[in-house]
Amino acid sequence: MKTEIHPNYHSITVVMTDGTEYQTRSTWGKEGDKLNLDIDPRSHPAWTGGTQQVLDRGGRVSRFQKKFSGFLKKD
């Protein structure tokens, strides 16, 4: 196996949206870094049945809603 071509694989701490933490190994960040999640399987509408609102990051959701607001309306 070639040396020095693979990314550094190390332990990090992942912090879920509810504050729980778990250890995993990743190529993200540096050894011991904390990855704070904005959305995770416990809070994402796709896994929770869609009862929670989707975060509008950068106005993407509002742009989509504006663009397709009248798409399924009957005259």
Curated annotation (Swiss-Prot):
PROSITE patterns: RIBOSOMAL_L31. InterPro entries: Ribosomal_bL28/bL31-like_sf, Ribosomal_bL31, Ribosomal_bL31_A, Ribosomal_bL31_sf. Keywords: Ribonucleoprotein, Ribosomal protein, RNA-binding, rRNA-binding. GO terms for molecular function: rRNA binding; structural constituent of ribosome. Belongs to the bacterial ribosomal protein bL31 family. Type A subfamily. One of its GO terms (biological process) is translation. It comes from the Bacteria. The lineage of its organism: Bacteria, Pseudomonadati, Pseudomonadota, Alphaproteobacteria, Hyphomicrobiales. The keyword Metal-binding does not apply. The keyword DNA damage does not apply. This is Large ribosomal subunit protein bL31. One of its GO terms (cellular component) is ribonucleoprotein complex. The gene is rpmE.
